[in-house]
Amino acid sequence: MLSLLLREVSFLTVVAPTFDSRSRLLLIAPHPDDEALACSVILQKALRAGAAIRVVYVTDGDNNPWPQRALERKWTLSPSDRQRWGNLRRAEALAALRALDFAVSDVRFLGLPDQGLTGLLLRDCDATLTRITQAIDGWSPTEIW
């Protein structure tokens, strides 16, 4: 089975992006920490090249109860607990970007509901997509990740 899988993916090519001082990178992260976990090398490469970078977080990551329950040793989480968790995740994301020497003035938090985005799109697709589109159009990126 593994050899079959390896044969199937053998055609894949890894593309390493190149950046320069004219590059405008827009990184869209579903939650805080996704940018650091998935794209920190891309961010570092773009920063070294002098590219302009904006990071947009779609949610605050406030509705991920399992790590919060474990860390706080609290089973039932109130809305204020979740809001506090989202604020903590925002602060951690900004700290991670600062560690990469990133200008946090180029960070946007859309604050859309974590684990509620599908429902929001079903209820009010146009308004939701408008918020996301404005983050893209307002930046005029040359690359979107």
Where are these regions (language model features)?
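Active-site beta-strand->loop->alpha-helix modules in alpha/beta enzyme cores, enriched
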Residues: 1-145
